[in-house]
Amino acid sequence: MKRNLALLPLSSIIIMAVLTESSFANAEIESLAELSGFSEVPQIFSEALGTAAIKGNGTLLNYQINMTGIGQVTGVDIHQGEETENGDIVVTLFRANASEGPLNGVLAGTITNSSFQGPLAGKGMKDLTDLISQNRTYVNVYTTKFPNGELRGTIVTRGNLSVDSGTNNGSMPTTTG
């Protein structure tokens, strides 16, 4: 009898860990970033502006980036880093190539665990969402005019939301421009 009681606390810990992870996988999160040249490090002047919306759960994140007044976009990344520093790329969202043609100001897609690189390579979605909730990630948009970045914005979490009961489960469009 003592043997079974001794295992009870251990089994409770295991059950709590499983419940916590599955609760995270079902939690809806929403984050936003306002993109401008003034957020670049160092700051640059650009008339271009943009927004990045990220929404999803512990399994995947959908993103949509809208840009106006921008020239030829050559790349878009999510970086790990504070607002005042340049950090490592953790997710590549876009790289220009001849077959895709130019980006017209709207970029949308999905981030999964296989998207991670740099400090997040081999890690899970929770690692990225933890960084986002700590305001330690930013979106950076590169152009031919500003190869080190024309638009940048810290990704700020909007909290946990209830799962949308609609047919798209709250996901954003995945059409690229």
What are these regions (language model features)?
Residues 9-18:
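Bacterial N-terminal signal peptides
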Residues 3, 14, 22-24:
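Short, intrinsically disordered, low-complexity terminal segments
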Residues 21-76, 80-177:
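Metal-centered catalytic cores of metalloenzymes
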Residues 1-10:
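Bacterial N-terminal signal peptides that target proteins for export
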